[in-house]
């Protein structure tokens, strides 16, 4: 398929090296996931885990960024989303490196004997509130199925001693998540606060935790400059993925 044709594909998002269909997934491809997939530290990793894989976006981004020897497990509870993730992965250059599991992560973890150097998740963060249009979207948006303490506990069960567990969250929720993680024995090692432009306060935060203590590196990322174009920093982070960047 030519690039000009692939650009016109509907019901999904076209990246430089792969296409993500998301019409059967409750949560669509968005800036949060793209930021996390491009930002998570991958140096030296051998095995990755994507918790709540959805359309497979994060697993595909990690596959693009890592060596051919790196294996990735993508766990998704909702069967339609998991099926679409599998289809997206089958059509990508990395089908042999990514394994999709339709499972509850809390049960799946208990059956694993391997540990992961990198665990990544774009987790739900809303408390139960306004009713969603579908049960699938409610599951993707709310923490009722997998709350944050359970998510942190799952990651702790299967991470290597020097591994990283990375998430993206709204700024204030991220601060609470950090306090919770620290109370559970995690160490914050990387933090990037994300703002739409220089005039606005950060609205998202990228966090990387590790079981191993060490210095925490913090910075700020501005998505758009005063001219409304993508900033140099955002371009440098994501240009390997965005089609027209």
From Swiss-Prot:
One of its GO terms (biological process) is methylation. Keywords: Cytoplasm, Methyltransferase, S-adenosyl-L-methionine, Transferase, tRNA processing. GO terms for cellular component: cytoplasm. It catalyses: adenosine(37) in tRNA1(Val) + S-adenosyl-L-methionine = N(6)-methyladenosine(37) in tRNA1(Val) + S-adenosyl-L-homocysteine + H(+). Its EC number is 2.1.1.223. One of its GO terms (molecular function) is nucleic acid binding. Pfam families: MTS (PF05175). It comes from the Bacteria. SUPFAM superfamilies: S-adenosyl-L-methionine-dependent methyltransferases. The keyword Methyltransferase applies. It is an enzyme of class 2 (transferase). It is found in: Cytoplasm. Belongs to the methyltransferase superfamily. tRNA (adenine-N(6)-)-methyltransferase family. Specifically methylates the adenine in position 37 of tRNA(1)(Val) (anticodon cmo5UAC). NCBIfam families: tRm6a37MtseTrmN. This is tRNA1(Val) (adenine(37)-N6)-methyltransferase. It comes from Shigella dysenteriae serotype 1 (strain Sd197). The gene is yfiC.
